[in-house]
Amino acid sequence: MSAEELVASPKLSKEEKKARKEAKKLKKAEKAAKEATAQEGVATEEVKEEVGKKDKKDKKEKKDKKRKEVDQEEAESPSTSTAATEEPPKKKKKSKDADSSETPVSTATPTESETPALSKKQQKKLAKASAAAAATSSAAAIPAPTVPTTFTAEHNTFLTSNNITLTPSLFPPLLSIRDLPINSKLQPFLNKFEKPTPIQACSWPALLSKKDVVGIAETGSGKTLAFGVPGINLLSQLPPVTGSKKGRGQVPGQIQMLVLAPTRELAQQSHEHLSAFGEQVGLKSVCIFGGVGKDGQARELSQKDTRVVVGTPGRTLDLADSGELDLSSVSYLVLDEADRMLDAGFENDIRRIIAHTPGHKEGRQTVMFSATWPESVRRLASTFLNNPLRITVGSDELSANKRIEQIVEVLDNPRDKDFRLTHHLKAHLKVHPNSKTSPTRILVFALYKKEAQRLEYTIRRAGYAVGALHGDMTQEARFKALEAFKTGQQNVLVATDVAARGLDIPDVGLVINVTFPLTTEDFVHRCGRTGRAGKTGKAVTFFTGENHEKSLAGEFMRVLRDVGAEIPKEMDRFPTTIKKKEHGSYGAFYKETSNAPAPTKITFD
């Protein structure tokens, strides 16, 4: 080789050659990923990030620096760098003119045969991300039905009379079910209801307009249909999305609506309502919860017509992490009884579940319902909801139902509870006799499982048809007890607080709190099992002032005063101070920061 050729094509070290080859491979891989994404019709940021992260992990800092140097040399002299990176064929020398006239490789457009194939793992990620993006984009592409935006005097009267606050006031309440702009196949199911409840009337216009909503309302206010009607209506317009084949040989349909609930009983109840409503348009709902085997639930999820899932956070996260539940196409997410889920310690599970779903930028609509509006719920809403409309029916503080008659009996001796219990059972059934056509239902609450078992035995010995509902029972036994109580086979049900929240048991005429719960929140939700759907009810509470009850006396009396209930004079001997609530982990020294910014996710390469 002549001196001129040496100058034109300087000899490079092995490391520099290797770095240039890596740079070429990286450019080709990026170009191939872009072409594959263009063929799918989707160019999402997630695909770019995944491909970029995969490539960056395989490169060291030293190679990155050398690649930058090579790129600079190519920009200055493309023909020289191209000639240097190409190995000349054996037994054949290239002239200087031939080298300079050759087209640089770095600027050439690769053909299909030259494009390097992505790895199987990258192809799977690309296909999954493309399918999810297509599903959420189709949800966003569906136009929202037209709803009125002008408030009339009738609307303002409705809001005032029901003590409803809209923040901000964008949509007036929908006062007639027949005015709902929904799928015509769904309308006959709703026509059996005379009129919407306050939370339904205010939620439907905003949710049908594809807005995120936070609903704060008392238990028994019809929240299931408040979020269920817009969700099922949206899915009735969306095409089903088929997932990829899983390791067990199952081909599951991807879920498009996810509802999270704090307890198995509430999840089962919401599932029943959504199943009945979804049947009108051929949608199937699956309920997933712990306490039973996963295999049966996984088989149901694998059915192609399964598009709605109602579940508890623990089992939902378990199935999502194992790949048996695909949440990448969820376009409608509901957090039901959000305050209860946070109280039960499910916040981390909820955050991990939401991480499996698309973001609101990809078209996901998020709905959150709660009985109260504490700081923990506000923080969760600010993180995952996009400029939500907040609907408050009544107060956002804890308050009891004013339609429930409250009777408080202060007992000096806890042993008097059994006698007073049987007295109230007999008195109530005398006024409201039990019959097959009009069963009388009485709900008795105990604090602990052993106490529930003892009370069940005591009531049965007194000659009443009684069942039980507590944590030591199998899931099958719990279902049977609930069904017997709902159908009237057993008119008395003894339960722990596992049944105190969210259960919609029709026509519960009397609630008896044998032992006061550990919090006033649980007291309100226990009493909320009666007086539902606009009806009246009655609650009897035995109060002894022992153990935890003394410290809750002040808050208990505040709840009674708010609903205008009579407070016995015997309560005067208990302190009226309302104790500051303590954080479960940090105690009384925990500081809530309502204006704290949302957490930022930081990724380290």
UniProtKB/Swiss-Prot annotation:
Transmembrane segments: none
Motif position, DEAD box: 336-339
Main location per the UniProt record: nucleus
Disulfide bond annotation, renumbered to this chain: none
Catalytic activity as recorded in UniProt: ATP + H2O = ADP + phosphate + H(+)
InterPro entries the record matches: DEAD/DEAH_box_helicase_dom, Helicase_ATP-bd, Helicase_C-like, P-loop_NTPase, RNA-helicase_DEAD-box_CS
Lineage: superkingdom: Eukaryota
Its EC number(s): 3.6.4.13
Domain spans labelled Helicase C-terminal: 424-575
CDD domains reported in the protein's UniProt record: DEADc, SF2_C_DEAD
GO cellular component, one term: nucleolus
Localization per Swiss-Prot or TrEMBL: Nucleus, Nucleolus
Record field: compositional bias (Basic and acidic residues): 45-55
Compositionally biased residues, Polar residues: 104-114
Positions with biased composition (Basic residues): 56-66
UniProt entry keywords in alphabetical sequence: ATP-binding, Helicase, Hydrolase, Nucleotide-binding, Nucleus, Ribosome biogenesis, RNA-binding, rRNA processing
Motif Q motif, chain ranges: 175-201
Binding positions for ATP per the UniProt entry: 217-224
KW Nucleus (keyword) present: yes
UniProt function note: ATP-dependent RNA helicase required for 60S ribosomal subunit synthesis. Involved in efficient pre-rRNA processing, predominantly at site A3, which is necessary for the normal formation of 25S and 5.8S rRNAs.
Domain notes: The Q motif is unique to and characteristic of the DEAD box family of RNA helicases and controls ATP binding and hydrolysis.
Similarity section: Belongs to the DEAD box helicase family. DDX5/DBP2 subfamily.
Protein's name according to its UniProt entry: ATP-dependent RNA helicase DBP3
Gene encoding the protein: DBP3
